[in-house]
Amino acid sequence: MILKNKLTKETLDIPYSEFRIKFAKEIQDAFESYRKTQLNKYSWNFKDDNSLEFNFYFELQWNFNHFGNSNWYIEKI
């Protein structure tokens, strides 16, 4: 994975497993924001709650970059 810092333009090239460890708090914050957004949608009442986490990780790059409040963003997976 290639991550880039929005402020310093520093680039990290790390494996997914290291990303999960190093950015655990940012991932959790992004997931909670994603979860709240999805559950507030009227149409979500007709869907399965168990698919929330799957859907979040399926589009991890977009969700982390848009729902997370981090100085880092995923440039490429």
Q: PLM ranges: what are they?
A:
Residues 7-9, 51:
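Glycine-centered tight beta-turn/hairpin loop motif at sheet-sheet or coil-to-beta transitions
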Residues 14-77:
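Acidic, low-complexity, intrinsically disordered interaction modules
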